[in-house]
């Protein structure tokens, strides 16, 4: 089954709502229409940018999707500072990132919590981008494949085959995020293939062949084509390189070159 690559920008805590509009406009202007037939392009933005991005994308009928970077596990109630999946759905979000290593490290989020957040998003028709990845010491010990497979299993607990068919998984080796270090294409393929084999076990071959697995971790325009060209890598979760609309457009265009 041919999987359309997904190139998703994760802006993290960058760009206010005015900068967000300018960045998406630049991205849309810089990426010719024919590329949208080859790759899906998305941005996951700070909560405060969502309404502005929604208005721009819907008003100009842009072929770009968008989403948030986190979601509450709760539906509603006395949870100060939290944002529910229903709120995100009302803002037209297609995606929400859950389990990013920065959430796991700085906010103590467990894989069990990540799974509950993913289910909360799915219940509102939002596709979760579930992030997994190993720290440097695990990579150096040579146990990274087993580590990531078990982390993925725990982060998908309670999700049905139908849920998994609407889910995206992003493999982000923690040692490569924001460091300039990039896993080789072979490294990315090794882990992404193991993740796909896990999905076969959990949900069957048909779901596994349709599910998109992204690579994240210092993805650049110069490296994206080789990585996305791997048989089990279906796009990228792009951090810093997505903050400039024109640069992100170039990266997406380069990813499209591997699509037949």
Curated annotation (Swiss-Prot):
Entry function: Involved in the gluconeogenesis. Catalyzes stereospecifically the conversion of dihydroxyacetone phosphate (DHAP) to D-glyceraldehyde-3-phosphate (G3P).
InterPro entries: Aldolase_TIM, TIM_sf, TrioseP_Isoase_bac/euk, Triosephosphate_isomerase, Triosephosphate_isomerase_AS
Principal location class: cytoplasm
Residue numbers binding substrate: 10-12, 178, 218, 239-240
Assigned GO CC terms: cytosol
Name of the protein this chain belongs to: Triosephosphate isomerase
SUPFAM superfamilies, sorted: Triosephosphate isomerase (TIM)
Catalytic center residues: 100 (electrophile), 172 (proton acceptor)
Enzyme Commission code(s) on record: 5.3.1.1
Main enzyme class: isomerase
Pathway: Carbohydrate biosynthesis; gluconeogenesis; Carbohydrate degradation; glycolysis; D-glyceraldehyde 3-phosphate from glycerone phosphate: step 1/1
NCBIfam families hit by this protein: tim
Cellular compartment(s): Cytoplasm
Organism: Corynebacterium diphtheriae (strain ATCC 700971 / NCTC 13129 / Biotype gravis)
Reaction catalyzed: D-glyceraldehyde 3-phosphate = dihydroxyacetone phosphate
């Amino acid at each position: 089954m041919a999987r359309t690559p997904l190139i998703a920008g994760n802006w993290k805590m960058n760009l206010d709502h005015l900068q967000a509009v300018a960045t998406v406009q630049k991205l849309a202007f810089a990426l010719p229409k024919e590329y949208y037939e080859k790759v899906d392009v998305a941005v996951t933005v700070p909560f405060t940018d969502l309404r502005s991005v929604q208005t721009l994308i819907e008003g100009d009928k842009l072929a770009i999707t968008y989403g948030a970077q986190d979601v509450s596990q709760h539906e509603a109630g006395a949870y100060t500072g939290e944002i529910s999946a229903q709120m995100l759905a009302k803002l037209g979000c297609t995606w929400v990132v859950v389990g990013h290593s920065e959430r796991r490290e700085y906010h103590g989020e467990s894989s069990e919590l990540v799974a509950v957040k993913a289910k909360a998003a799915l219940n509102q028709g939002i596709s979760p981008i579930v992030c997994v990845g190993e720290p440097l010491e695990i990579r150096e010990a040579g146990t990274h494949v087993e580590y990531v497979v078990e982390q993925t299993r725990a982060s998908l607990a309670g999700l049905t085959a139908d849920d998994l068919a609407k889910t995206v998984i992003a493999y982000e080796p923690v040692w490569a995020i924001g460091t300039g270090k990039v896993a080789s294409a072979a490294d990315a393929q090794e882990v992404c293939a193991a993740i796909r084999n896990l999905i076969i076990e959990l949900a069957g071959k048909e779901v596994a062949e349709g599910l998109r697995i992204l690579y994240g971790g210092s993805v650049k325009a110069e490296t994206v084509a080789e990585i996305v060209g791997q048989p089990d890598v279906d796009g990228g979760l792009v951090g810093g390189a997505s903050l400039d609309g024109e640069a992100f457009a170039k990266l997406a265009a380069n990813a499209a070159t591997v699509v037949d």
